[in-house]
Amino acid sequence: MIVKSFVLRIDSVNEIVSQCKYNTISIIRLEQKLNDLFYLLINKSIINKEAIDNEIIAITSYLNPLFQDFTHNTPLIDFIEFIKGYLTHAISYNVPISSITDYLLAQCTNVCAKAISQLAGVNFMDGRELVVCEDKNNINSFNWNSTLTNIRTKCHDKQQLVISGGYARTLKGEVLSIGKGGANLMASLVGVAMNADRIELFVDNENVHNVSSI
């Protein structure tokens, strides 16, 4: 078994899909450009949630190539409507910007990774169901026992699997980012827990580092 982490570049979707088909557990994270589009959207919505059309259009246009093979782009349309509804709700209840950002980016990672899994014809798993942190204010406070138990229990019979990467849950169920290298960390955790033959960690400049599993 090989465990890989991928940066989801929209212009490389076909290549990523092809690599997810062969005895591979793939961890997907978003490209920085898409993260930046969400930061703009969230900051603009805080100022005036009625004036975010341009930001919504930018995100939709960016994601459209990933969903063009789905009937009527339904998953993307549903996700865009979800974003609008969530922002209205979160802003009304004064949810902290950091929590809004983590939650929406985790949801986007989930939607994109699920699309990749469907295009590849393999199973999908929400990475937030695997990695557990003790404290939302300390991303290094991993609950290793719970995390490794989750991975071994939920992935043990999966030879082909796509996982949304970079986000975790606290013991209280709160969603949080585990940092820019979160998908690589998750790939390493999965690889070690599953005794993978090889772990491949992809970085933004497209260099690939192959790390033997422990």
Regions found by a protein language model. Give the residues of each.
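Nucleotide/pyrophosphate-binding catalytic subdomain
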Residues: 1-214
